[in-house]
Amino acid sequence: MTVTSDFTQKLYENFAENTKLRAVENAVTKNGLLSSLEVRGSHAANLPEFSLDLTKDPVTNQKQSGRCWMFAALNTFRHKFINEFKTEDFEFSQAYTFFWDKYEKSNWFMEQIIGDVAMDDRRLKFLLQTPQQDGGQWDMMVAIFDKYGIVPKAVYPESQASSSSRELNQYLNKLLRQDAEILRYTIEQDGDVQAVKEELLQEVFNFLAVTLGLPPQNFEFAFRNKDNEYKKFVGTPKEFYNEYVGIDLNNYVSVINAPTADKPYNKSYTVEFLGNVVGGKEVKHLNVEMDRFKKLAIAQMQAGETVWFGCDVGQESNRSAGLLTMDSYDFKSSLDIEFTQSKAGRLDYGESLMTHAMVLAGVDLDADGNSTKWKVENSWGKDAGQKGYFVASDEWMDEYTYQIVVRKDLLSEEELAAYEAKPQVLLPWDPMGALA
């Protein structure tokens, strides 16, 4: 239908007759939408106390960057380091992994560009839209750890560009789109593509070294623990990982909950074009039902390990209060609006996808062992939430959490076989390919 002036006039009249909406209009225009609709009772119902609580370590801060997936992964290692080596506080360098991820993503992008994707193919347009970005997924982080190791933050500290990455991304993507044209032209002219690509990668490396700083190949690091014991390390980043973390990351798998019709449960999935290290670990997910998803996360925490997880953090989120709940805001009583889409509907119609990775650091269980709320360690600094920690209600977890990483030995034989089977390849723009 065409929107006529008579129809619009009727809407005006309907609104004017609704005294409740006029009152809400005054509140919202003065105070903002969410501040006006906030439900105070949700605070009392989600107090930050948990029957299983794995850490109270100070939180980290990704600042103005999209490195949450790195922070979450390194935070899981960090808790292990602090506990085993009895340190007051400690951080691994998030800037170090950031450097190598940018470098590898640039090479990954170039490899896709010199493939056989036609210029008018939507997949090529997808690649060129964002040649690289800050975000990533767990398996991409594993690929970086496997190849480059890790270093302490004191050895490779933050730079302006790692803490605020907008300019870096703007000009690195500008460079990579130019490189894409150069590589395509070289192919058309039957030139030496690999030789040209190596020259272009040198430019990328130089750009990253200038903006982020040259990462160490060997280093020394010393510290004293709470017992005043002195420890010193001399070696490479990979040797440091092996000595001070020592986790075999091949023993961990990505588990998702994607209840859409195109993704049957108990099957594995990967996403076309998604990755960073050519020849590195493939991004791969096992899709399970939500009840099983939560039981796996609980089992890992009961074994003493925190859990890396990915979610849509902007949904029903009260950042200042540190709450992720379905009743944080009341649209129905105030605006006569209800949001009734299912999790599958939100995925299918573009309303939701994974936007952020954090750490599950605790859970509150009822008498039957079922979860009621979850302790979430964020990476937005101590001023967000409750000293950097958030509380997620169990219902919010059901609706807006999409991915966890758990030990393989927690899977059943059937689940492990499904994970290890050849994965179904999803389209590049599938929501399960979203980067945290």
From Swiss-Prot:
One of its GO terms (cellular component) is cytoplasm. It comes from the Bacteria. The keyword Hydrolase applies. GO terms for biological process: homocysteine catabolic process; proteolysis; response to toxic substance. InterPro entries: Papain-like_cys_pep_sf (IPR038765), Pept_cys_AS (IPR000169), Pept_his_AS (IPR025660), Peptidase_C1B (IPR004134). The keyword Protease applies. Its EC number is 3.4.22.40. Keywords: Aminopeptidase, Hydrolase, Protease, Thiol protease. One of its GO terms (molecular function) is cysteine-type aminopeptidase activity. The active site is at C68, H356, N378. It catalyses: Inactivates bleomycin B2 (a cytotoxic glycometallopeptide) by hydrolysis of a carboxyamide bond of beta-aminoalanine, but also shows general aminopeptidase activity. The specificity varies somewhat with source, but amino acid arylamides of Met, Leu and Ala are preferred. Pfam families: Peptidase_C1_2. Hydrolyzes naphthylamide-substituted amino acids as well as di- and tripeptides in which the half-cystine residue is involved in a disulfide loop, notably in oxytocin and vasopressin. Also has a bleomycin hydrolase activity. Belongs to the peptidase C1 family. Homohexamer. This is Aminopeptidase C. It comes from Lactococcus lactis subsp. cremoris. The gene is pepC.
